């Protein structure tokens, strides 16, 4: 997936500026994002878009898919405002801001001209840029990933209950959420289901290259 950091930054900020609810500090939020690595950070360390600009690209991908899902399942009219979709999609991964750092990773490069050999063939060692999670002392910690993202977002945008639930639980029932039972949460809050679906479609289908 080709990523244009500057174009994505412009689009992300343009969407965020459409949030106009009382109490929202959008200017402060944008300043926070621009003062961080949000627009240049990866979306993960290994699984999807683990490249510069991946986090912002993923957030926009989730937004686009979320809009499509809402239009698909609510053809007669969405129960959610455009503002709600913008907020939960763009902000669901705020926890990943300033979370990762670059390090040099040694990898095997296989070719017929390799000077070394293993069971897979000839290779040479090469150094590539990779990402890893910072130590807990060097990044924001509050709760699990979803809770961290909800807290950061709520600092700048007053969230309605369903928005908070959606951001907090967007990863679904993985290990970090145990011993929570996600079924009653998803049964009560459809926005949480839709955000979860959009996130997973983006991660495992659209960005799975």
Feature locations, PLM:
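Generic alpha-helical structural signal
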Residues: 10-13, 27, 60, 64, ...
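Amphipathic alpha-helical segments within well-ordered protein domains
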Residues: 13, 17, 63, 67, ...
């Amino acid at each position: 997936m080709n990523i244009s950091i500057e174009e994505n930054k412009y689009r992300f900020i343009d969407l965020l500026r459409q949030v106009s609810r009382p109490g929202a500090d959008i200017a402060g939020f944008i300043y926070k994002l621009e003062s961080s690595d949000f627009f240049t950070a990866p979306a993960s360390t290994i699984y999807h878009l683990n490249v510069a600009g991946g986090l912002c690209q993923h957030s926009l991908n989730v937004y686009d898919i979320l809009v499509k899902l809402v239009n698909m399942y609510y053809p007669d009219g969405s129960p959610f405002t455009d503002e709600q979709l913008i907020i939960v999609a763009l902000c669901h991964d705020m926890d990943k801001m300033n979370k990762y750092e670059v390090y040099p990773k040694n990898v095997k490069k296989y070719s017929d001209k390799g000077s070394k050999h293993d069971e897979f063939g000839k290779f040479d060692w090469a150094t590539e840029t990779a990402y890893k999670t910072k130590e807990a002392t060097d990044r924001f910690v509050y709760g699990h990933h979803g809770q961290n993202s909800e807290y950061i977002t709520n600092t700048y945008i007053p969230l309605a209950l369903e928005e908070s639930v959606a951001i907090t639980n967007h990863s679904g029932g993985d290990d970090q959420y145990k011993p929570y039972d996600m079924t009653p949460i998803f049964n009560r809050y459809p926005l949480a289901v839709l955000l979860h679906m959009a996130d997973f479609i983006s991660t495992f289908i659209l960005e799975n290259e």
